Amino acid sequence: AYISMVDKAGGVPMIIPPAGDMTSLLDSIDGLIVSGGPDISPATYNEEPGPMTEEFYPEQDFSEMGLIEGALEMDMPFLGICRGMQILSVAHGGKMHQHLDTTSGHEGHGGFFGKSTEHGVIVEGDSLLASIMGDSFTVNSLHHQGVSDSGSLEISARAEHDGLIEGVERKDKKFCVGVQWHPERKGHDSLFTALVK
């Protein structure tokens, strides 16, 4: 789905292997998407794994954080999707709710045992996300973890029903956006078009 969305937006998609020479990888691309995947190792945000924290791969976490740091140093357009938003937040000093269904006030976001749901999001009016997608819309929700603290990132969107962080961005970069939902499954073409522009 990511490949077709980038292609549809006018970009040339390229899948990056998990290991390799990061500098030459970044030199060969014009923008970076970090997408969904397994849980993030709690060690990256100085916590022990909770009982519901699923399989995680610290090497992937540190590799992705290195890619993100390198891409942003080059002011390369960046889009983090689901886990990609989470690892972007952790890379900026953020923290995670390890399991939303056991976090008071944040139950029911789906994502555990393959559950999926939908809810509204409210977007900050002065954000890049609002200029791309508007100030409120419906998103899919299939994540059992969530960002509890976005670190040095600006919060650009929250879930309408419980205030959970659903969007983050860096205003000092030309395009650095993270979203908790899966825009490629929701037909949110405008995000990919804005990334490729």
Predicted regions and their residues:
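N-terminal beta1-alpha1 cap of cysteine-dependent amidohydrolase-like domains
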Residues: 1-79, 90-91, 97, 101-138, ...
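Conserved G/P- and acidic residue-centered "switch" motifs that form tight phosphate/ATP-binding loops
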Residues: 82
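Hydrophobic, aromatic-enriched interface-forming segments
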Residues: 85-87
